[in-house]
């Protein structure tokens, strides 16, 4: 059994300070991951099973945001856009096992306001958890006569929106968090 990986990644970020209370930032990320797995399993002396799995991930993202201060209020807000492609195929038969593309916007913001000895904060972020190749596989693995494991090529990514409100007074912190998962 042999596995090889090729990984390429890069990012760029530009900040522009308009004045002492306002900063803008824009940027982009890109990554490419390629993986090749060769499996050879000898089932008995007369036969063997061979597979070569090829996986590719391509992610392109762009983001923009700003930091602003107005009196005692500090705010950060922005947006990120991601395009993500996942390709997983049997390199011997050229059968595509998984070919998925996801495109999504991820907004975020945070506000911070001190009032006397109390620091108040409110924030919202959006995140994604994509299924792995292993979870998306359409093959079955038999561990013994009582145990089998299989993937599900129709799994979808999980998007989570986190909203948090917090109060801090000296060393005492109180927070309320809400999560929406879809």
Predicted regions and their residues:
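Outer-membrane beta-barrel translocator domains and adjoining extracellular loop/strand segments
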Residues: 1, 36-45, 87-95, 133-141, ...
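Generic preference for hydrophobic/aromatic residues in regular secondary structure cores
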Residues: 1, 104-105
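Face-selective signature of the C-terminal outer-membrane beta-barrel domain
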Residues: 1-89, 114, 118-119
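Hydrophobic, lipid-facing positions within transmembrane beta-strands of outer-membrane proteins
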Residues: 6-12, 58-64, 105-111, 120, ...
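Outer-membrane beta-barrel strand-turn architecture
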Residues: 16-20, 67-74, 105, 110-117, ...
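Phenylalanine-focused residue identity feature
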Residues: 24, 39, 63, 81-84, ...
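Transmembrane beta-barrel strands of outer-membrane/channel proteins
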Residues: 26-32, 77-83, 111, 122-126, ...
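Outer-membrane beta-barrel signature, preferentially recognizing the C-terminal barrel domain
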Residues: 51-57, 97-100, 128-181
């Amino acid at each position: 059994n042999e596995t090889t990986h090729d990984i390429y990644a890069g990012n760029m970020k530009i900040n522009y300070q308009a004045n002492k209370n306002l900063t803008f930032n824009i940027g982009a990320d890109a990554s490419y991951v390629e993986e090749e797995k060769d499996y050879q399993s000898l089932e008995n002396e007369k036969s063997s099973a061979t597979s070569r799995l090829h996986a590719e991930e391509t992610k392109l993202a762009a983001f923009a945001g700003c930091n602003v201060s107005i009196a005692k209020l500090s705010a950060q807000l922005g947006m990120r856009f991601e395009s993500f492609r996942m390709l997983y195929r049997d390199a011997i038969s050229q059968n595509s096992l998984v070919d998925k593309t996801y495109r999504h916007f991820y907004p975020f913001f945070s506000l911070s306001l001190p009032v006397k000895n109390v620091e108040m904060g409110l924030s919202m972020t959006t995140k994604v958890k994509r299924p792995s190749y292993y979870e998306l596989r359409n093959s079955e693995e038999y561990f013994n006569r009582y145990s089998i494991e299989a993937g599900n090529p129709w799994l979808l990514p999980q998007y989570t929106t986190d909203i948090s409100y917090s109060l801090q007074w000296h060393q005492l912190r109180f927070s309320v968090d809400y999560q929406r998962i879809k």
